[in-house]
């Protein structure tokens, strides 16, 4: 479904919905906690910023003075207006920098040494949204085990042929051992092979290559440090960026780059120069994989739905691939199964929604690249003029106001745009000042700014160390 080992809070929520405990994933899949993403050196200045997940405890400030009718967090507006770093008022960033997770021990349980009998997670109070990092191979195997335990039949084999009925619906799969599997509905999860959606149905591909040029990645592993980070790190490189994902026993890393500017050999050389040593590569030839940013315009055709890499892939910067898959599954199963045979309107709605989601993701990814750096041909590609039209319109609006809910749609919050935009000065300090000077709600945020900074620091001290949290749930 995805190319990496990270995800968004949708995955953690989805596992919770499926009654797969977080402790199970920590025990069996080398899982760690993800509070958000740390973007390092994207302005070529050695600095960093975060796109953190939201808090769930309103006392922490972002929501305490931010109700449904306000377009953006007054505390974020205050930090920009004061020329202060957003990181000083972002609780999830603070706990990430302290190698902590947004969980506190319940007072009575801490005082009396209470140990829950049901699940160790019950000993903690969650005060922020999280996702997980995971060993992809171990997670796939664990989900297969759980599926078998719950009655799912697993057939191991390689598909040799896909047969269609007179209406062009998939009615059977033939394996290499000539075993035949009768089908009434099919999910194409064949990854970049796109076995059915691409090779059988020849669906139309919508490419983002014109404005998202990265198309290759070289994965590698490095050793874990004493402290386990509670975030994914995205480190800007000369011709792309490097992901660094902490598992319990190692970091999973990779260099995502533009192959029109450097070769695979040059990418490997840049990796080793950056690290100062040769890391462990999954492949002996130090090779990687290629991909094309885009999505199918019709991921659902007849009785086949493509999910994950088979349907779309933008790039792994915001760990969106599994997120899109979960949203797709959720939309499919909102409909009664007996409608699937004659479901043209349902299919059209699904396809429209998934393409719209991928378009939104591609815009948000491009926005990350609109940095202040211009040291290589790669970074010079990401100008306002080359941006998607809808993104240009958003940026034009942000010259006179802060990002709002109407900009965000259902996929990104206005805070998400502000986190990224404030890092490379797309969000204007004078605009934020105008909000505070002319709005009582935003002035309230500014007046309470110092209080919330101090209160958040206090709450950070109450949160649990990441490694201790993982050990406690094993």
Where are these regions (language model features)?
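Residues forming anionic-ligand binding surfaces in small-molecule and nucleic-acid pockets
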Residues: 112-124
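Predominantly flavin-linked oxidoreductase catalytic cores and closely associated redox partners
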Residues: 122-270, 329
